[in-house]
Amino acid sequence: MAKYDSHLKCSFCNKSQDQVRKLIAGPGVYICDECVELCNEILDEELYDGNTPPAAAPAGGRRETPKKPSRSLPSLAQLPKPQEIMRYLDQYVIGQEKAKKVLSVAVYNHYKRLAAKANPGSVGVSELDEVELQKSNILIIGPTGSGKTLLAETLARMLDVPFAVADATTLTEAGYVGEDVENILLRLLQVADMDVEEAQRGIIYIDEIDKIARKSENPSITRDVSGEGVQQALLKMLEGTIANVPPQGGRKHPYQDCIQIDTSNILFICGGAFVGLEKVIEQRIGKKSMGFIKPGEQLSVSREQRMANALKALEPEDLIKYGMIPEFTGRLPVVATLDPLDEKALEAILTQPKNAILKQAQKLLRMDGVELEFEPAAIAAIAKEAYRRKTGARALRAIVEELMLDVMYEAPSRRDLKYIRITAEMVERRSTRELIPHPSTLPKPESA
């Protein structure tokens, strides 16, 4: 360190010694603390490859993660239109037409808002250019296995943006055992390879959001750290804030480096089954049958169908009565409701989507040289059993995996298996062993 002299200057930025905190002397040159810090940042940017963490920030300070080149936001002309989004969703999601239309419009408007922020003045009308477009997050309500998560991840795949899924049941208010809400952002950041700019244009799906409803309609004297407390913690994140995210996850503490993420451009989609919400709606309108079914038919209507009928009359006040605080409900203005899946819908899910479960099984066996075919009656039997289990489309894969176990086990080692036909009887027995002859029953090759 050189002795104090107001005439000494940094050889790089030309600032005098009284303009900087430190001035380091070398053989005929001087460098200030600000230029040293700048050099460190330049080295970090050049050496950082996305996997090796950047150099630690000085004690008490924060250093932003060096940014890799990010894809720019698409222009308004490049954005897929709602009808294009709808057609893409149709390839992967069966039914749920109203929900797909709601999501298509909401997602299009969200990324149109981002395009407007990136290109101010794009409207061309001066009084409209000054209008600020607010973010509209989405709430999806539907029974288990109806396609809530599938819709969200399909949207993210089409738009080619980072997508992360979080479970609301693991979250607690800051200071209590459990995950901080900022860990949701860390998952998105990890999917984006720690690229902050890329993560800030992504989509986060928060599942089981109904599980953080407060325990009673009236505010409680005791702390509700996994219910109302989590809703309060999520408010700013949903609305848009600069959040400090610990890069290693876990709880934050004052002496660790944090990555700052702006959530104002992140689209949040929350989903939940909201079991019992139909009772709240029916109580509000004062009708037990809801007017959607004839008198005397109530006993024949399933709980899922009763829920679907009730959701047609859903109002924000019903969600508040259920246990969502008014501020939280207000930050999810777009609501999409999903219908329960009947047997016909489950049959379609087995065969029609691009990545249908039966198509996946056929592809796996074709790789072993085996052609697989399902009789229509077998498909109907699988759908019937899945409907009986009351877990929606999730049951389909479990049934098919159980049914195909023996075939998948034998096929890679057997050259005599060229064609397999699955019947309804096999589905009912959950076994395909009769299709596979035991090696001892095959004719022995003639000796030379």
Curated annotation (Swiss-Prot):
The keyword Nucleotide-binding applies. It holds the Pfam family zf-C4_ClpX. Zn(2+) binds at residues 10, 13, 32, 35. GO terms for cellular component: HslUV protease complex. GO terms for molecular function: ATP binding; ATP hydrolysis activity; ATP-dependent protein folding chaperone; protein dimerization activity; unfolded protein binding; zinc ion binding. Residues 1-51 form the ClpX-type ZB domain. PROSITE patterns: CLPX_ZB (PS51902). GO terms for biological process: cell division; proteolysis involved in protein catabolic process. Residues 50-76 are annotated as: Disordered. Keywords: ATP-binding, Chaperone, Metal-binding, Nucleotide-binding, Zinc. InterPro entries: AAA+_ATPase, ATP-dep_Clp_protease_ClpX, ATPase_AAA_core, Clp_ATPase_C, Clp_protease_ATP-bd_su_ClpX, ClpX_bact, P-loop_NTPase, Znf_CppX_C4. ATP binds at residues 143-150. Component of the ClpX-ClpP complex. Forms a hexameric ring that, in the presence of ATP, binds to fourteen ClpP subunits assembled into a disk-like structure with a central cavity, resembling the structure of eukaryotic proteasomes. ATP-dependent specificity component of the Clp protease. It directs the protease to specific substrates. Can perform chaperone functions in the absence of ClpP. Belongs to the ClpX chaperone family. This is ATP-dependent Clp protease ATP-binding subunit ClpX. It comes from Synechococcus sp. (strain JA-2-3B'a(2-13)).
